[in-house]
Swiss-Prot record:
GO terms, biological process: photosynthesis
Subcellular localization, as worded in the UniProt entry: Cellular thylakoid membrane
Source organism per UniProt: Thermosynechococcus vestitus (strain NIES-2133 / IAM M-273 / BP-1)
Record gene name: ycf4
Name assigned to this protein: Photosystem I assembly protein Ycf4
Chief localization: membrane
InterPro entries: PSI_Ycf4_assembly (IPR003359)
Any one annotated GO CC term: plasma membrane-derived thylakoid membrane
Family: Belongs to the Ycf4 family.
Keywords per UniProt: Membrane, Photosynthesis, Thylakoid, Transmembrane, Transmembrane helix
Membrane topology recorded in Swiss-Prot or TrEMBL: Multi-pass membrane protein
Job of this protein: Seems to be required for the assembly of the photosystem I complex.
UniProt entry tagged with the keyword Transmembrane: yes
Length: 192
């Protein structure tokens, strides 16, 4: 899933521009949560098998492992992996970091919304009048750890990020999105 607009300005609906932001429900997070779950369960069952002297795994023979130190170490790694997998699955279920950027000329406000972890600040929302938006800033850093981000420069608030955390957006999509937002709001683009 990309940050392509859900609704582009059209003759009927040229007053609202809305972009979804992909949070923790990225395909890579599903892959890692599944891999860590399977590996953690395997390690935990191998450690438990060495303690109980009963084979709990469909493949391999962990009964031959000596419980101390091998079985206990494998069991510990299995528990640690299962805890990490639980964290990943909960972050996916809660869609941490997901949300949207909405630019609404009808109400005269920009609304940036993200989901956080459960608790007091589960819903993270930044809202400001369109008149406070000074520019759309594009940051591009290439190299070993590339960074391609869009920021909204807001009077009195500094730079507010518009793009998701994780894999950088393709350059063409980043430039198109930045230009579309700047044109829609009537502000300049910085950083190109």
């Amino acid at each position: 899933m990309t940050n392509s607009p859900i609704t582009e300005p059209s003759p009927r609906q040229e007053s609202v521009l809305r972009y979804p932001v992909l949070g923790s429900r990225r395909p890579s997070n599903y892959f890692w949560a599944t891999a860590v779950s399977i590996g953690g369960l395997g390690f935990f069952l191998a450690g438990l098998s060495s303690y109980l002297h009963r084979n709990l795994l469909p493949i391999g023979n962990p009964i031959d492992l000596v419980f101390i130190p091998q079985g206990i170490a494998i069991g510990f790694y299995g528990v640690a992996a299962l805890l990490l997998a639980t964290y990943l699955w909960l972050a996916i279920a809660w869609d941490v970091g997901g949300g949207f950027n909405e630019f609404n000329k009808e109400t005269g406000f920009v609304r940036i919304f993200r989901w956080g972890f459960p608790g007091k600040n589960r819903q993270i929302e930044v809202s400001c009048p369109i008149s406070d938006v000074q520019a759309v800033k594009i940051v591009i850093k290439e190299g070993l750890n590339p960074k391609r981000s869009l920021y909204l420069k807001i009077k009195g608030r500094g730079e507010v990020p518009l793009t998701r955390v994780g894999a950088p957006l393709p350059l063409a999509e980043l430039e198109t999105q930045g230009a579309t937002i700047a044109s829609f709001l009537g502000v300049p683009v910085e950083g190109l």
